[in-house]
């Protein structure tokens, strides 16, 4: 099946060119120059985020959490189950899905990998299935309470090995993400009984404080 007026050119640059106008060409892979503009950078990360959320693999991951791990209930209000209310996977309490996609894009750039939304999204999904992404099951009420900072989510309530994720990806964190980690660590030490869920020594070793 052919897409009307579109011809795929299988060269190294991986360009898709309009048949009726050779000069109308869209590169299949992105270059570093494509991310110089902040708005273009943000649009790309959001596109990756959307691709992850809407993928069949992500739906399979959520199904695994609910039906294999048995986490089909709110981990704040444990009596609220998926049977009676919508219970969703919330990325956090430190890294949002946008953060994770952004870190993966930075990794692709710094390691010289070919970049497009599909490749970065695949890498993000691999992190989910390797259980390195921190997340917690929340109902609508607890989700709103978390975003309003009415409740504190402890990493011990979550699935995913956040300490390994930090150790393996810290060199790709920007200052905003580093600040999030240090701020959460401060809350753990001063406003909550973290009980070692977040490995403070790991954070201090791999993440320098933001001045």
Regions found by a protein language model. Name each.
Residues 83-85, 145-148:
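Short, non-ligating residues that shape and space the ligands of small metal-coordination modules
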Residues 163-170, 204:
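Residue-level detector of alpha-helical secondary structure
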Residues 77-79, 140-143:
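Cys/His-coordinated zinc-binding microdomains
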Residues 1-83, 96, 172-211:
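A boundary/linker detector
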Residues 79-134:
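Histidine-centered nuclease catalytic patch
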Residues 73, 88, 138:
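The −1 position to Zn-ligating cysteines in a subset of zinc-ribbon hairpins
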Residues 89-98, 154-164:
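Short cysteine/histidine-rich metal-coordination sites, predominantly Zn2+-binding motifs
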């Amino acid at each position: 099946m052919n897409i009307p007026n579109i011809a795929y050119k299988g060269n190294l640059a991986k360009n898709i060119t309009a048949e009726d106008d050779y000069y109308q060409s869209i590169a299949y892979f992105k270059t570093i120059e494509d991310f110089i503009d902040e708005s273009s950078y943000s649009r790309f990360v959001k596109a990756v985020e959307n691709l992850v959320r809407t993928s069949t693999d992500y739906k399979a991951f959520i199904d695994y959490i609910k039906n294999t791990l048995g986490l089909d209930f709110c981990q704040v209000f444990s009596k609220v189950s998926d049977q009676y209310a919508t219970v969703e996977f919330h990325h956090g309490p430190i890294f949002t899905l946008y953060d994770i996609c952004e870190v993966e894009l930075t990794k692709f750039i710094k390691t010289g990998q070919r970049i497009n939304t599909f490749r970065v999204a695949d890498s993000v999904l691999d992190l989910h299935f390797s259980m390195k992404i921190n997340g917690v099951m929340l109902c609508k009420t607890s989700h709103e309470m978390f975003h309003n900072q009415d409740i504190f989510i402890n990493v011990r309530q979550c699935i995913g090995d956040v300490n390994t994720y930090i150790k393996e990806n810290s060199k790709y964190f920007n200052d905003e993400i580093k600040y999030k980690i240090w701020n959460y660590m401060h809350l753990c030490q001063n406003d909550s009984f973290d009980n070692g869920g977040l490995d403070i020594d790991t954070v201090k070793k791999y993440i320098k404080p933001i001045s």
